[in-house]
UniProtKB/Swiss-Prot annotation:
Oligomer status and interactors: Part of the 50S ribosomal subunit. Contacts protein L32.
Domain of life: Bacteria
Protein species of origin: Campylobacter hominis (strain ATCC BAA-381 / DSM 21671 / CCUG 45161 / LMG 19568 / NCTC 13146 / CH001A)
Keyword annotations from UniProtKB, A to Z: Ribonucleoprotein, Ribosomal protein
Pfam families in alphabetical order: Ribosomal_L17
Cellular component GO terms, alphabetical: cytosolic large ribosomal subunit
Cross-referenced InterPro entries: Ribosomal_bL17, Ribosomal_bL17_CS, Ribosomal_bL17_sf
Name of the molecule in the record: Large ribosomal subunit protein bL17
Family under the similarity heading: Belongs to the bacterial ribosomal protein bL17 family.
GO terms, biological process: translation
PROSITE patterns: RIBOSOMAL_L17
UniProt KW Ribosomal protein keyword: yes
GO MF term list: structural constituent of ribosome
Amino acid sequence: MRHKNGYRKLGRTSSHRAALLKNLTIAIVKNGKIETTLEKAKELRSYVEKLITRARKGDFNAHKFVFAALQDKEATNMLVNEVAPKFATKNGGYTRIIKTRTRRGDAAEMAYIELINE
């Protein structure tokens, strides 16, 4: 059965959603921590953790896979060469979501999503 195997649509078309996740991933790789809405953070966690798991191998194919997803040389090199080796012995759980506040304009729940430093 495939119940509950969906994803959050985030009120966007599929191409807009893909671009959003790509841009948020680049931001979290470069900065280590970003603030976004809670729903975006939860969806981003799944996307980022799959990329980090793939990047842990560090071989040519890992570079190719990550670059295909991010299309940013700087972020790809940071992810494969700096971020992923930190998690070489860890199986999943590379990110942390911390709820912060409700946004004043639309009362959306905000949260920080960050890479865990170990």
